[in-house]
């Protein structure tokens, strides 16, 4: 090379060593040779955040917080955090150790392999082959080491990492959007992080945990961690596709959004593109995966403005009751829900609706007191969902009280379909709420469905509406499990 080219080469190499963002831009062609690089402000922000953590760990300074990053899909998050960052960090200090994880072993290994492809590329070897190399006897797709004890281990959510430790623990999309619909999958991912992955730092006060993901459910890993006291232990970076929801974190990032359109990356996520995504993903998918708000206010299947608030109760109307019993009083499960309503002239008035967490004896004692308080008469009926303790509740109340109690039928449709069946009655304004402190909790759960943590109040509403549409349990009845 000529002196001019040698100088340019040396300057580029030095610049890449000094700045992870510059390394990201220069290494792009190695992993995406057919895709032109399009950069945006969030790339530099995330790169700078990771670089600061890397340099702090090298200096052996205590950390302030672990990190949660929520960004839309197709925003280059995995290439930055899981593919390129470990490679750049090894240039700075090849003794660093990484454990990375994704929702599937296939994806996790694919990302790990891309990191290794950079290391094996001619572009990289010309610049940093003298800094480190991959050991031949420790060179698997899911685990490889360099000649300075640096290690990269790729695992998946639910996978074992026994005996492994790292300076960086990276979780990249712990759930796919499809998996997020399963409470079991969500619980498994959250418990795996809490009980297995969380403890894998070599130095708990210095090493860092990094979670980068699109939001897919209110109870996904981000929601699980940010909903507890543990939120104080995490720096939360939230970059939604638009600034519509006021969900940008930290607030200082708001200045990077287009002042006219409110878009975070107009070149890739234009208004037209976002409209197409909204059509394809639906309201809930769009709210979570693009807006990073998986429980959008008043944008779900049930809207707040469908419900009128009444100041007066229908005094002469018969009050009926719906009971959706919980499996246990465990805080993790849905609570038991009780709903009182009247039905006159094809219109429902919800008199009261409460959530209670009570074991069987306390619940059986509570029910008679609550229904009497809410207007029970000899003409009233109490319908109990037969799941969990439902059958036993019916039997006990019939045996020990004079209440008119009836066991209902099991559901025949999925949750979304059951709500869809009653949506016309709701949207037409035929269901009102008697003014009370319970209104806000009730409306909050309804408007967040189906992404809300609990759906027991929704369950009761569906049962109440269907009860009158199809007539005293003789027709079609739909409600929640």
Where in the sequence are the language-model features?
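Conserved nucleotide-state-sensing and coupling region of NTP-binding domains
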Residues: 101-158
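ATPase catalytic-site recognition across NTP-hydrolyzing enzymes
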Residues: 252-325
């Amino acid at each position: 090379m000529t002196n001019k080219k040698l100088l340019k080469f040396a300057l580029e190499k030095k610049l890449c060593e000094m700045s992870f963002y510059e390394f990201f831009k220069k290494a792009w062609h190695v992993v995406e040779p057919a895709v032109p690089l399009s950069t945006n402000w969030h790339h530099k922000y995330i790169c700078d955040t990771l670089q600061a953590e890397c340099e702090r760990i090298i200096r052996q300074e205590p950390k302030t917080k672990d990190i949660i990053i929520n960004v839309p899909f197709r925003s280059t998050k995995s290439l930055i955090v899981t593919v390129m960052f470990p490679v750049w960090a090894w240039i700075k200090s090849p003794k660093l150790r990484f454990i990375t994880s994704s929702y599937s072993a296939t994806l996790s290994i694919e990302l790990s392999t891309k990191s290794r492809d950079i290391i094996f590329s001619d572009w990289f070897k010309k610049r940093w082959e003298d800094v480190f190399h991959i050991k031949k006897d420790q060179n698997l797709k899911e685990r490889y080491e360099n000649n300075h004890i640096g290690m990269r281990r790729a695992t998946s959510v639910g996978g074992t990492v026994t005996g492994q430790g790292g300076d960086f623990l990276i979780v990249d999309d712990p759930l796919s959007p499809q998996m997020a619909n399963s409470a079991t999958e969500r619980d498994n991912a959250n418990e795996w992080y809490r009980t297995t992955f969380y403890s894998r730092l070599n130095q708990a006060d210095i090493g860092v945990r990094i979670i980068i993901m699109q939001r897919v459910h209110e109870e996904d890993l981000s929601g699980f961690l940010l909903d507890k006291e543990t939120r104080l232990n995490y720096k939360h970076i939230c970059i939604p596709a638009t600034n519509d929801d006021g969900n940008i974190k930290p607030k200082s990032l708001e200045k990077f959004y287009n002042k006219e359109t409110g878009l975070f990356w107009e070149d890739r996520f234009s208004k037209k593109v976002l409209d197409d995504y909204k059509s394809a993903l639906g309201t809930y998918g769009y709210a979570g995966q693009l807006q990073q708000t998986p429980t959008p206010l008043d944008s779900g299947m049930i809207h707040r403005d469908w419900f009128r608030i009444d100041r007066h109760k229908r005094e002469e109307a018969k009050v009926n009751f719906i009971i959706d019993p919980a499996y246990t009083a465990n805080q993790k499960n849905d609570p038991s829900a009780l709903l009182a309503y009247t039905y006159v002239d094809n219109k429902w008035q919800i008199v009261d609706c409460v959530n209670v967490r009570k074991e069987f004896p306390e619940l059986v004692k509570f029910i008679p007191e609550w229904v009497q308080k809410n207007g029970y008469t000899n003409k009233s009926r109490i319908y109990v969902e037969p799941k969990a303790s439902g059958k036993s509740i019916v039997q006990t109340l019939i045996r020990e009280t004079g209440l008119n109690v009836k066991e209902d039928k099991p559901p025949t449709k999925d949750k979304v379909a059951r709500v869809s069946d009653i949506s016309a009655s709701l949207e037409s304004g035929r269901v009102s709420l008697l003014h009370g402190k319970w209104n806000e909790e009730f409306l909050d759960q309804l408007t967040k469905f189906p992404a809300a943590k609990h759906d027991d109040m929704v369950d009761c509403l569906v049962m109440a509406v269907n009860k009158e549409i199809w007539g005293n349990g003789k027709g079609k009845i739909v409600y929640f499990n």
